[in-house]
Amino acid sequence: MKSFGLCLFILVSSPCLLQANLSSDYYTKTCPEFEETLVQIVTDKQIAAPTTAVGTLRLFFHDCMVDGCDASILVASTPRKTSERDADINRSLPGDAFDVITRIKTAVELKCPNIVSCSDILVGATRSLISMVGGPRVNVKFGRKDSLVSDMNRVEGKLARPNMTMDHIISIFESSGLTVQEMVALVGAHTIGFSHCKEFASRIFNKSDQNGPVEMNPKYAAELRKLCANYTNDEQMSAFNDVFTPGKFDNMYYKNLKHGYGLLQSDHAIAFDNRTRSLVDLYAEDETAFFDAFAKAMEKVSEKNVKTGKLGEVRRRCDQYNDYKG
């Protein structure tokens, strides 16, 4: 299985918001069937491959948190240039997520060629899939252009990892213009995620503590050790971030943290740090508060550092620039 641990992939670049020319009805006249087509394709794909929702949400974060929502993550590497897609942290991005974007783009190009950007497709698909698995409706606007650059060297240092300290994680969020409250809400996406064993093996196979970390439920730790016993020989071995309702977008992730079911080191940190604990408690008790905060934070992320006008293009193929010569 591919890793779907969302791991707080956070932007370090300028926090300014560029919302120029974005609107909810951007394609009403130029491609009126866009949203209907998108919803039908994501519905069919999610039914056929239930991990599509979490995979696409992860793809959204890995795109938008590195220089904005500009579909740079979709560009394939060439002999001359290694793209973001092949950065170390992106190599486990799920094929189903790329596939659903390609399917939507192909269908939309047949109806209205050279109109709808790949970045708008990714944002729209993520919104629809979150709702499909029980999550809140995220208000999104359209009008983004696709990036003219995708460079793997721009990724490192902009995406946080699960073994980082809370100080480090918070500083990354703050550098991107996101508050601690928004950070805690966005991490709730772990409610439908799962992670490779290698991402939490150091917690459960600690030689100094045979029963697992003291903050982890001992029975949970024991089950994880069984599941991941062969992880060094099978890199695809994974565990759900939310062991109780892994396919449903709800507030169970936060409830789990309060009872020792946090999978990643960053999960434990966010549950007990003085700066974040009260928010974890709030979202564990009040799912409506979590949904509202998550939707607003997602909307903010989706509109950060948007490319418009000559800063981008509408790609004919999401994995290639329009001037690609081979």
Curated annotation (Swiss-Prot):
Cofactor: heme b; Ca(2+)
PROSITE patterns to which the protein is assigned, alphabetical: PEROXIDASE_1, PEROXIDASE_2, PEROXIDASE_4
UniProtKB keywords: Calcium, Disulfide bond, Glycoprotein, Heme, Hydrogen peroxide, Iron, Metal-binding, Oxidoreductase, Peroxidase, Secreted, Signal
Residues with attached carbohydrate: 21, 163, 206, 230, 274
Disulfide topology: 31-112, 64-69, 118-318, 197-228
Recorded GO MF terms: heme binding; lactoperoxidase activity; metal ion binding
Residue positions binding heme b: 190
Family note: Belongs to the peroxidase family. Classical plant (class III) peroxidase subfamily.
Protein name per the record: Peroxidase 6
Organism field: Arabidopsis thaliana
Gene field: PER6
